[in-house]
UniProtKB/Swiss-Prot annotation:
Cellular component GO terms, alphabetical: mitochondrion; nucleolus
Main location: nucleus
Domain OBG-type G, first and last residues per copy: 158-353
Name of the protein this chain belongs to: GTP-binding protein 10 homolog
Subcellular location(s) per record: Nucleus, Nucleolus
InterPro entries named in the record: G_OBG, GTP-bd, GTP-bd_Obg/CgtA, GTP1_OBG_dom, GTP1_OBG_dom_sf, OBG_GTPase, P-loop_NTPase
Biological role stated in the UniProt entry: May be involved in the ribosome maturation process.
Binding site for GTP: 164-171, 211-215, 287-290
Listed GO MF terms: GTP binding; GTPase activity; magnesium ion binding
Originating organism: Drosophila melanogaster
Length: 383
């Protein structure tokens, strides 16, 4: 009996560890070195081959986890250039090393200076240049290649980002609207790593949705790994705030905040982390409308969340933002029984289409302005 108990205890521990093991990787540190330049040949004035370079190339469908699995270790070196010889006065260039990384990776050096932002498919950057081949300027000695450490920081690229406190129902919504299968349970912090799902429409249009782990108050100051999660909404085009209509309490040690206070709290967290996020189009979903008393609360709170500025005086000072969100729409839903899910999908699409049209017109105006500047006052008028 004791042996059985020990076996069950061991099994439960291993399962717990497996659940919290970080399978999602969004940062990676690599040591990169360009190839050494080949030596020249003084007798004949020969020039050594240049050392190879280390490139990063953005590819869709990749993850940093796959990048790590494809490397023997986290050190990458390009080949050295060939020495000059009688048979080959100009030494051959060393072979380059190309590392494929996910789209959305930002590359930083050890001083946290941005080297490149690989936000498009096939975007490329050199992270370690090759050494110069030996020539008269170097006394015919090949120069060493660039040797340094780079940090890769992945920021997910999705159309929609789900934002909310723990246990608000974000994962349930993601499962209802998309093909994703996130873990769902009736306790906070079910989602411990970002999840991405795709909403597919009948006309083959698709929208990607990122479900981020629940935030806590103080996320802007990196409490609860807030920075690790908040950074992923920087590249999203539309923010969807998910709030429990009955409010939320993280633990018995924390105060219970009602629905309106939670909206202000989320507003404040984003403002303190990056005020520009408040300029993004946003939608508010008030969840758990299937429960008794939800409609009465919604009737009272809808006018207030429709105009957050009007209720700032009643908002607790620690939650009061300087700039308030202006929601494009407010939808009461029940993610559990899929109530109004079709309306949510339609609303997300309409908002993104409107945003794309606005961007198209802005780009068109920029093109016209550039043409006006090139043509000048003598050319034909462009309307």
């Amino acid at each position: 009996m004791v042996q059985i108990f020990k076996f069950l205890l061991k099994s439960s521990k291993s399962t717990g560890r497996a659940h919290f093991r970080p399978t999602f990787l969004d940062t990676l540190r690599l040591a990169v070195r360009g190839g050494h330049g080949g030596n020249g040949l003084p007798k004949y004035g020969g020039v050594g081959g240049q050392g190879g370079c280390v490139y990063l190339v953005a590819k869709e469908g990749l993850t940093l986890r796959k990048v790590v699995q494809g490397l023997k270790d986290k050190r990458v070196a390009a080949s050295s250039g060939e020495d000059s010889s009688k048979a080959s006065i100009f030494g051959r260039r060393g072979a380059d090393q190309r590392i494929e990384v996910p789209v959305g990776v930002q590359v930083y050096d050890d001083q946290q200076k941005l080297i490149a932002d690989l936000d498009e498919h096939e975007a490329t950057c050199i992270v370690a240049g090759g050494g110069t081949g030996g020539c008269t300027a170097t006394n015919f000695l090949g120069r060493p290649g660039e040797n340094r450490t780079v940090n890769l920081d992945l920021k997910l690229i999705a159309d929609v980002g789900l934002v909310g406190f723990p246990n608000a129902g974000k994962s349930t919504l993601l499962k209802a609207v998309s093909n994703a299968k996130p873990k769902i349970a009736a306790y906070p912090f079910t989602t411990i790593r970002p999840q991405i799902g795709t909403i597919e429409y009948r006309d083959l249009r698709s929208i990607t949705v990122a479900d981020l782990p629940g935030l806590i108050e103080g996320a802007h100051a990196n409490f609860g790994m807030g920075h690790k999660f908040l950074k992923h909404i920087e590249r999203t085009r539309l923010l969807v705030f998910m709030v429990d209509i009955f409010g939320f309490q993280l633990s018995p040690k924390h105060p219970h905040r009602d629905c309106l206070a939670n909206v202000y709290a989320l507003n404040k967290e984003l403002e303190l982390y990056d005020p520009s996020l408040l300029e993004k189009p946003s939608v508010l979903l008030l969840n758990k409308m299937d429960k008794e008393g939800a409609h009465e609360i919604f009737t009272k709170v809808k006018p207030l969340v429709s105009d957050l500025a009007s209720g700032l005086e009643q908002c607790p000072e620690e939650l009061r933002p300087k700039q308030v969100l202006n929601f494009d729409s407010i939808v009461p839903i029940s993610a559990m029984n899929s109530s109004k899910i079709t309306q949510v999908k339609s609303q997300l699409r309409r908002t993104l289409v409107r945003l794309a049209e606005k961007q198209f017109l802005a780009d068109e105006d920029q093109v016209k302005e550039k043409l006006r500047q090139r043509v000048g006052v003598v050319g034909p008028k462009i309307t």
